[in-house]
């Protein structure tokens, strides 16, 4: 037998089998020659499910969506050259959003590097600081120690991707021709697998009893506190945060991605309209908390970030089990290096419940009054973008997923996604906050979460049209709501809008595209609606039926800005009297 083929088959067979043994059973593959042996072995392994995606950029975002939904590593595989470079945007997002990805790139062997060989470039540390770990893999050899080595490398990669903070790991495989493995070999999946093969078990970072007692004593003296919750991946966090908040008596400013706004948990302490009422300058200057305790990523709301920056006299505690806590406000005074779930459980177990005080009551009161104003959009007849969120939430069934794109949709979710006993899982790409790869990420998530509705603007939709191919190839079910204001709607809210001479060409960027034909090219249905009754009917139809459904609603950018500002101004006026004389 050809020793090279035997080495290639057993070495890569051991690697693929170890991935499956470690429960990395989903692989998104883009076609290419140098990655042939890995692709064939993955396709052949009975425990691994493969997804084909031709465009590497979309493929990587698709895997990102799966990994976000599963909360466990998903692998991506491509050939050498610029194919690997196209993974870069999704790798950056995965790193900053703390999503576990295994990035597997095939490469030319060392003798074909830097000599002008085709489809060869330097892939060493290709993703730089945007991966948790880079592994330059050894060339295949038909020796037992090499089979053990490649299994150990798989284990280390999965552990690195999975441990806090989760993130992407890059493994680069140099491979020589010929590239076709021999599936007739005995024990193809068994090489290097024995009693010594490691399993990595992640523990939970906890607090010392001394620290718990000390912090509880401090909290008992600090009556005016706030709990701020951003995007967080822990499934248990919703219940334990709600219980912790009730014990402390502190209001919870809950970002929509915290998933604290919806569900059957106790929502008494949840504040959901802070992005609107924190625009009031008097409130920012006079409502001074003694302590702010933060969990998860930084919330979407700019008004909240500005408010936090003003709280110079407060204690700012961030709970983060990694050493890379997130605080763009630069106000951290203490970092608790522990699992947020473990932190809340430990504190709640030993705390006495504080009765609701005036501090909580005034936050709750102003939140309720603000919500009354914002709910007026539910009666609007005009095509207002904020109402897209309120109407979809009404339609979605229990347990559904709402994926919101960056730019305006996530901000409208922040403003108009109110507390609701119906559980709706909210997702978005808030690592680097780009508009690229949104369709692909949502489609990846849809392999795990059904039904799923994506709300996306027309520019973001255009940016990832290639991603629609996954819905066709893999028979996926998704309803995509395209909010088409013919351009970049968010820029109308920013100072750039005042540059009238160049605004449309540089920022408004109207495309004037009709997306109907491209959606049908990918096997989907497309409908453009006018009127809210038709909108609700079509979204409901998309949720019930299988396949790709795109519902387009056209809005006016200028009118949308005016309606948003009208609501914010009305809210500010209504709460002004409530704040007069309140200087505490």
From Swiss-Prot:
Its cofactor is Mg(2+); Mn(2+); thiamine diphosphate. InterPro entries: DHS-like_NAD/FAD-binding_dom, MenaQ_synth_MenD, MenD_middle, THDP-binding, Thiamin_PyroP_enz_TPP-bd_dom, TPP_enzyme_TPP-bd. Its EC number is 2.2.1.9. GO terms for biological process: menaquinone biosynthetic process. The keyword Signal does not apply. It comes from the Bacteria. SUPFAM superfamilies: DHS-like NAD/FAD-binding domain (SSF52467), Thiamin diphosphate-binding fold (THDP-binding) (SSF52518). Pfam families: TPP_enzyme_C, TPP_enzyme_M_2, TPP_enzyme_N. It catalyses: isochorismate + 2-oxoglutarate + H(+) = 5-enolpyruvoyl-6-hydroxy-2-succinyl-cyclohex-3-ene-1-carboxylate + CO2. Catalyzes the thiamine diphosphate-dependent decarboxylation of 2-oxoglutarate and the subsequent addition of the resulting succinic semialdehyde-thiamine pyrophosphate anion to isochorismate to yield 2-succinyl-5-enolpyruvyl-6-hydroxy-3-cyclohexene-1-carboxylate (SEPHCHC). Homodimer. PANTHER family: 2-SUCCINYL-5-ENOLPYRUVYL-6-HYDROXY-3-CYCLOHEXENE-1-CARBOXYLATE SYNTHASE, PROTEIN PHYLLO, CHLOROPLASTIC. Belongs to the TPP enzyme family. MenD subfamily. This is 2-succinyl-5-enolpyruvyl-6-hydroxy-3-cyclohexene-1-carboxylate synthase.
């Amino acid at each position: 037998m050809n020793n090279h083929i035997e080495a290639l088959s057993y070495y890569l067979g051991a690697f693929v089998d170890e991935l499956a043994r470690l429960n990395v059973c989903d692989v998104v593959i883009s076609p290419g020659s140098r990655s042939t042996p890995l692709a064939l072995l993955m396709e052949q392994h009975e425990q691994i499910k493969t997804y084909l995606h031709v465009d590497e950029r979309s493929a990587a975002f698709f895997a990102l969506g799966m990994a976000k939904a599963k909360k466990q590593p998903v692998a991506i595989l491509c050939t050498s050259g610029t194919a690997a470079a196209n993974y870069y945007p999704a790798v950056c997002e995965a790193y900053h959003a703390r999503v576990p990805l295994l990035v597997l790139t095939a490469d030319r062997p060392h003798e074909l590097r830097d000599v002008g060989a085709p489809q060869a470039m330097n892939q060493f540390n290709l993703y730089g600081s945007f991966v948790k770990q880079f592994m330059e893999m050894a060339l295949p050899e038909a020796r037992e120690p090499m089979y053990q080595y490649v299994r150990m490398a798989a284990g280390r990669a999965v552990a690195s991707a999975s441990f806090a903070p989760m993130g992407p790991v890059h493994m680069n495989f140099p491979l020589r021709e010929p590239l076709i493995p021999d599936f007739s070999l005995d024990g193809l999946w068994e090489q290097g697998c024995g009693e010594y093969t490691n399993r990595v078990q992640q523990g939970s970072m906890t607090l010392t009893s001394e620290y718990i007692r000390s912090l509880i004593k401090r909290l008992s003296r600090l009556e005016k506190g706030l709990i701020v919750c951003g995007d967080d991946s822990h499934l248990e966090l919703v219940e334990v945060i709600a219980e912790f908040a009730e014990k402390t008596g502190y209001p919870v400013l809950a970002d929509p991605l915290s998933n604290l706004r919806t569900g059957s948990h106790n929502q008494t302490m949840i504040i959901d309209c802070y992005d609107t009422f924190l625009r009031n300058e008097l409130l920012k200057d006079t409502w001074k908390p003694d302590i702010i305790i933060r969990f998860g990523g930084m919330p979407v709301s700019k008004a909240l970030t500005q408010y936090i920056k003003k709280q110079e006299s407060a204690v700012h505690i961030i709970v983060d089990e990694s050493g890379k806590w997130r605080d763009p406000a630069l106000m951290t005074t203490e970092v608790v290096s522990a699992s947020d779930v473990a932190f809340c459980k430990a504190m709640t177990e030993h705390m006495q419940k504080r009765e609701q005080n005036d501090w909580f009551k005034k936050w709750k009161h102003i939140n309720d009054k603000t919500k009354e104003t914002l709910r007026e959009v539910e009666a609007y007849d005009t095509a207002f973008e904020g109402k897209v969120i309120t109407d979809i939430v009404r339609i979605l069934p229990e347990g559904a997923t709402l994926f919101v794109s960056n730019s305006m949709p996530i901000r409208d979710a922040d403003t108009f996604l109110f507390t609701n006993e119906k559980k709706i899982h909210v997702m978005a790409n808030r690592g680097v906050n780009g508009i690229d790869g949104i369709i692909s990420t949502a489609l990846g998530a849809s392999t795990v979460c059904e039904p799923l509705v994506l709300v996306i603007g027309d520019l973001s939709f255009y940016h990832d049209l290639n991603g629609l191919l996954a819905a066709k190839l893999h028979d996926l079910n998704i309803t995509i709501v395209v909010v088409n204001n013919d351009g970049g709607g968010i820029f109308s809210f920013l100072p750039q809008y005042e540059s009238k001479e160049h605004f449309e060409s540089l920022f408004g960027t109207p495309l004037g595209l009709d997306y109907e034909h491209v959606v049908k090219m990918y096997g989907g249905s497309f409908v453009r609606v006018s009127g809210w009754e038709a909108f609700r009917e079509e979204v409901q139809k998309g949720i019930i039926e299988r396949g790709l459904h795109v519902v387009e609603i056209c809005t006016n950018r200028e009118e949308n800005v005016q309606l948003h500002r009208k609501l914010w101004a009305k809210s500010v006026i209504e709460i002004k009297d409530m704040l007069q004389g309140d200087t505490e």
